[in-house]
From Swiss-Prot:
Its EC number is 4.2.1.75. One of its GO terms (molecular function) is uroporphyrinogen-III synthase activity. The lineage of its organism: Bacteria, Pseudomonadati, Pseudomonadota, Gammaproteobacteria, Enterobacterales. Pfam families: HEM4. Catalyzes cyclization of the linear tetrapyrrole, hydroxymethylbilane, to the macrocyclic uroporphyrinogen III. It comes from Salmonella typhimurium (strain LT2 / SGSC1412 / ATCC 700720). GO terms for biological process: protoporphyrinogen IX biosynthetic process; uroporphyrinogen III biosynthetic process. InterPro entries: 4pyrrol_syn_uPrphyn_synt_sf (IPR036108), 4pyrrol_synth_uPrphyn_synth (IPR003754), UROS/Hem4 (IPR039793). This is Uroporphyrinogen-III synthase. Gene3D superfamilies: 3.40.50.10090. Keywords: Lyase, Porphyrin biosynthesis. The keyword Transferase does not apply. The gene is hemD.
Length: 246
């Protein structure tokens, strides 16, 4: 089994290193990269207006990293007042590391549906919620918080940019190297991988690979695109992906 990891740097390379240490054949093929978001310069002032009744949500490690770097450039700290939430354990740890605060997060899955089930988020009418995220992505969290009566705003902390590849060249490379398992961690990357691959390689290689994804939503999308051998990891971090690949 040869494994192709499509998640971005540095998590993709880290997973490849761990797999190789276990004797697996694995390759990194990041489909997207990240650059600073256009709303970052407004972050410090927006955070400063929040009170102890308000909420801050971090939706990825990348949002935390770019936000913290901007606060450092501005000579500001993470404010003590608001309550902090994260999409999952890995993002919560990243936010705790840079802020020192307790971060609330769902214990089961790193998805918006699980985050929204937290008891602290059931009665939030009149509270302000600032969501730190990248460009695009799902709107479920913001829409649900708004429906529950919160005043929701967003800060685009980073932008996802597609990395440019020659699709035919890459497909031939991975087919020749005997890749039989693909690891994909977002719908955007799944669509990118499918569209990047020429039709012949799509039919004779890509869609015949075993596909590891991180949610049932992604599995459904994969089935619509033509994959049949699909496995869903129990979480989105590298530990969960490593377990699923054993």
């Amino acid at each position: 089994m040869s494994i192709l990891i499509t998640r971005p740097s540095p998590a993709g390379e880290a997973l490849v290193s761990r797999l190789r240490a276990l004797g697996q054949v694995a390759w990194s093929f990041p489909l997207i990269e990240f650059v600073a978001g256009r709303e970052l310069p407004t972050l410090a002032d927006r955070l400063a207006t929040l009170t102890e009744n308000d909420l801050v949500f971090a939706l990825s490690q990348h949002a935390v990293a770019f936000a913290h770097a901007q606060l450092q450039r501005d000579g500001r700290n993470w404010p003590v007042a608001p309550r902090y939430f994260a999409i999952g354990r890995t993002t919560a740890l990243a936010l705790h590391t840079v802020s020192g605060f307790d971060i609330r997060y769902p214990l089961d899955r790193e998805i918006s549906e699980a985050l929204l089930q937290l008891p602290e988020l059931q009665n939030i009418a009149g509270k302000r919620a600032l969501i730190l995220r990248g460009n695009g992505g799902r709107e479920l969290l913001g829409e649900t918080l708004t429906a529950r009566g919160a005043e929701v705003s967003f800060c685009e902390c980073y932008q996802r940019c597609a990395k440019h590849y020659d699709g035919a060249e890459e497909a031939m490379r991975w087919h020749t190297r005997g890749v039989t398992t693909l690891v994909v961690t977002s719908g955007e990357m799944l669509q990118r991988l499918w569209s990047l691959t020429p039709q012949w390689y799509r039919e004779h290689w890509l869609l015949r690979c075993r596909l590891l994804v991180v949610s049932e939503r992604l599995a459904h999308l994969a089935r619509e695109l033509g994959w049949q051998d699909i496995k869903v990891a129990d979480n989105a971090d590298n530990d969960a992906l490593l377990r699923a690949l054993q």
